Amino acid sequence: SSRGSAGQTAAITALHDRVEEIKFLLGSLFQAASSVENGRDPLTRTLNRRFLPGLLSREFALVKSGNVPLSLLMVDVDHFKSINDTFGHSAGDTVLKRVAETVLDSVRASDFVFRYGGEEFLVVLVETEREKALVIAERLRSKVEEMRVPLDGAPPVTVTVSIGLATHEGHPDPQYLIDRADQALYKAKAEGRNRVVMT
């Protein structure tokens, strides 16, 4: 009947609209995924530091409105220059990759890991107070120390990291918190490396 075919046409049109909507949503999803992908450091798969200011501004706003804690870890590969000089840049890249994997494995899915410098990573630990951040940092340091990084044409190398830890204590400027984590890292290196220091 004509009523039946009209109903069928309406159903097909509705289905077509739904398919178009799903295609649009999938397109948006792939676009978002691609922008995150473009925001990653190609070697270590960690986030590019250009996204750090925006992320910290958002996290600082959450800290202020919800009174939730926030901690940062500044992680630096010890004696990285001598690894590069002794075994070559390819070996240095392998070490950085393995350290980055270990950092990513040691934190939660809700945390953020940035490639901050040549051999430096900055970890944003959301909703994490000082004591909990210290446990995470110590676990990370220990995991890296246990690694044996295989290199082409050379025996596996042992790697260590120094870590500076700072927890947000009310100062409104994110850079102030980064500087505190950096100062703690400097102290960790000055005290002999392969350790965690808090400010």
Give the location of each predicted region.
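Signal-transducing coiled-coil linker helices
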Residues: 3-46, 50-62, 67-69, 111-112, ...
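Conserved nucleotide-binding and Mg2+-coordinating catalytic segments in signaling enzymes
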Residues: 36-54, 75-89, 97
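Conserved metal-coordinating catalytic motifs of nucleotidyl cyclase and c-di-GMP turnover enzymes
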Residues: 44, 73-76, 118, 181
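Active-site-proximal structural segments of metal-dependent nucleotidyl cyclase/transferase enzymes
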Residues: 55-87, 103, 114
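Hydrophobic framework residues that shape the active-site pocket
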Residues: 80, 99, 113-116, 121, ...
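Short catalytic/binding micro-motifs of nucleotide second-messenger systems
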Residues: 105-110, 142-154, 167, 187
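Catalytic core regions of nucleotide second-messenger enzymes
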Residues: 115, 133, 144-161
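Catalytic-core segments of nucleotide cyclases and related cyclic-nucleotide turnover enzymes
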Residues: 134, 166-199
